């Protein structure tokens, strides 16, 4: 078993699927992001590590803490929401043939 002592944050993951926005609260995460967001980018750099097999995908939006129950995707942007990031990459990390955590972020 792998121990993640720095994974002490709760985040809310949002994913647009068709016309719906799925929401999932993930506990026991490592989440660090830059406060600065430029108007040209509308994006902030971050890294998220979530122990477990729940999939994270590029394009998912990650909110620091427990986020709103419902959001309007086109208005729920990192430029307007402190603590919100959008994943540019996401990848599973495996150990002994099993997914032990997912890493997502933007560099």
Feature roles, as predicted:
Residues 53-88:
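Short, acidic/charged, Gly/Pro-enriched secondary-structure junctions
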């Amino acid at each position: 078993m792998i121990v993640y002592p720095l994974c002490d944050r709760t985040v809310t993951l949002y994913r647009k699927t068709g016309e719906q926005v799925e929401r999932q609260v993930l506990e026991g995460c490592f989440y660090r992001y830059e406060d600065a967001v430029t108007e040209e980018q509308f994006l902030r750099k971050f890294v998220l590590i979530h122990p477990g097999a729940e999939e994270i995908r590029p394009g998912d939006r990650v909110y620091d803490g427990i986020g709103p129950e419902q959001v309007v995707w086109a208005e729920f942007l990192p430029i307007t929401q402190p603590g919100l990031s959008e994943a540019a990459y996401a990848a599973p990390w495996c150990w002994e043939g099993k997914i032990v955590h997912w890493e997502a972020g933007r560099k």
